[in-house]
Amino acid sequence: MMKILFVSPCYYPAIGGVEIQARLIAKELAKKHQVSMAAANLGFRHPQYVPGWLGKKMMIESLYNNLLASTYSSFKEGDIPVRAVTPRLSDGLGLLPILLPTLPLLRRYTEPFFDWFNYQCYRSVFGPKLEKLMQGVDVVHCLLVDYLGFAGLDAAKKLGIPSVCTPYVHPGQFGENSVIIQTYPRFEAVGTLTEGDRQKLISMGVPAENLHILEVVPILPATVNPDEFRQQHNLVDVPVILFVGRRSAYKGVKALLSSAHQVWQTIPNAHFVFVGPETPESLEWFENADSRIHYLGKVSEQEKGDAIAACDIFCMPSLFEILPTVYLEAWSYSKPVIGGKAQGVPELIEGNNAGFAVEQTPEAISAAITKLLQDPALSQNLGDNGNVLVNQNYSLSAVVSKSESLYQKMNGKPQASETLVR
């Protein structure tokens, strides 16, 4: 039995892709090991609007993870202690200097210095809290690499505890920078989402022996009722193309909508179902929509599962994805997937012969949809390939087993370099 501490900026009841993944994996690990969670944000608080010129110019949002962080109470979920490491009122003085680089002129001319300076302030407050929680711990796993991840790494180094991080971001994209990449060799292990990400980090100088693929897990209800879903939404005996996600342009919603008219030229009874919250930019896209367009908005996890199980094709031709769990969910029900050219997605979909990765244009999307609807055998084969992939590599037991093996290996591995990031 090992003692494992996860360090994450946010955790349940805060809800997000990373938080859901962390909760699933932690619960499964807790069946055999002592697992605890340390997090700064355990709620739903979003940055509040600060009126006037100051509110518009200052980087107010960045302060809600440190200086303006809410105070939460620790609790226990099943066998897992969830420790809140949010700052006390008395910690505010130590974090006060973090306010300075939010001023536009200072940020513009001294950003590298303030990145370093801010972290020193942050570590002075959060480091001791994390060190206290790490007493007797065998492995520290940092989820995402921000100031809390840096503090978790430094605390683990100070106590001689091996550490691993899973950045949950693709190399070179939003959420990662050169300072973060320079930090990776200090961890005993770094988890990447795909082999493509692993190769990219190797090319950027991260030692290959430090890099391990740690997949994500599809989020599925216990049972689904696709027939009931089709009956409820008047979709009986018609082809159904499903989109699940936020209605943002980069997700491919607008392009998919436009593709429908081209699909109807060949397959006029095809219906398009959109599940997910709206965005301000998307409101006009669905005005006066054809009756074969169904927008269901935000739904429960149960109804989302029913929708995926009921569709013929899952289509989300996104330009950017970090955790493409919805593709895995579609494959869990043997559905062929049409994705976009987001980093890592073509390798995931076409590399496993489980669908198509297309350009985000109505022409490319409609061609892929039409091809699948006109060739049921191909569609079934691609969906089955995806199902095999999920069962072999992305099941909860498979992902947890891989993490568990990595932790055990790290316990006997020499500590990584002690060089601090500057």
Please name every model-derived segment:
Residues 5, 191, 235-251, 257-260:
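Conserved donor-binding/catalytic core segment of Leloir-type glycosyltransferases
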Residues 319:
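Aromatic "clamp/platform" in nucleotide-sugar-dependent glycosyltransferases that forms part
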Residues 44, 244, 248, 271-284:
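Glycosyltransferase donor-sugar binding loop
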Residues 21, 39, 172, 180-224, ...:
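Donor nucleotide-sugar binding/catalytic pocket of nucleotide-sugar-dependent glycosyltransferases
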Residues 336-339:
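Short hydrophobic beta-strand element within catalytic cores of glycosyltransferases
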Residues 364, 371, 378-392, 399-405:
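A short, well-ordered alpha-helix in the C-terminal region of glycosyltransferases
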Residues 351-363, 371-377:
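Conserved acidic donor-binding segment of nucleotide-sugar-dependent glycosyltransferases
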Residues 283-303:
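Nucleotide-activated donor-binding/catalytic signature segment of Leloir-type glycosyltransferases, i.e.
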